[in-house]
Amino acid sequence: MNVILLDKIANLGNLGDQVAVKAGYARNFLLPQGKAVVANTANTEVFEARRAELEAKLVADLTAANERAEKINALESIVIASKAGDEGKLFGSIGNRDIADAVTAAGVELAKSEVRLPLGALRTTGEFEVEVQVHTEVKAIVKLSVVAED
């Protein structure tokens, strides 16, 4: 199924690209989310008429994401206290939600889906640098300090 992308989508294309995708992906994800329209003559004409508006929206989203990333990078080290054993091993773990809640409490809104922990949840005390993907093109780093609770 051919679709016209209304947004930049990782591993697929940019705004305005006409791409061939599987019908299920288009019907179940791209079309309901408003990220694409079916590529036919009528939709192509409508898209070309709205292209400038969509590009301006994309630029505005990118600018807002850059501003959020700067705020996140400007944060001091965020401290999360958790119960831990004598050797620094946590009873439990620090996951995406815990990190997102701590950053939000520090004053910058952050969703748990934006936090990237490629090695899984944090299970020891110490200093960590956690990557946050604010936008498909914008990433930020959060300095995190996990300490043992008294």
Curated annotation (Swiss-Prot):
SUPFAM superfamilies xrefs: L9 N-domain-like, Ribosomal protein L9 C-domain
Record has Transferase as a keyword: no
Any GO CC annotation of this UniProt entry: ribosome
Domain of life according to the entry: Bacteria
UniProt-recorded Gene Ontology molecular function terms: rRNA binding; structural constituent of ribosome
Protein's GO biological process: translation
PROSITE patterns hit by this protein: RIBOSOMAL_L9
InterPro entries, per database record: Ribosomal_bL9 (IPR000244), Ribosomal_bL9/RNase_H1_N (IPR009027), Ribosomal_bL9_bac/chp (IPR020594), Ribosomal_bL9_C (IPR020069), Ribosomal_bL9_C_sf (IPR036791), Ribosomal_bL9_N (IPR020070), Ribosomal_bL9_N_sf (IPR036935)
Alphabetical keyword list: Ribonucleoprotein, Ribosomal protein, RNA-binding, rRNA-binding
Residues annotated as transmembrane: none
Keyword field contains Transcription: no
Family of the protein in this entry: Belongs to the bacterial ribosomal protein bL9 family.
Alphabetized HAMAP family for the sequence: Ribosomal_bL9
PANTHER family: 50S RIBOSOMAL PROTEIN L9 (PTHR21368)
Free-text function comment from the UniProt entry: Binds to the 23S rRNA.
Protein's name in the database: Large ribosomal subunit protein bL9
The gene coding this protein: rplI
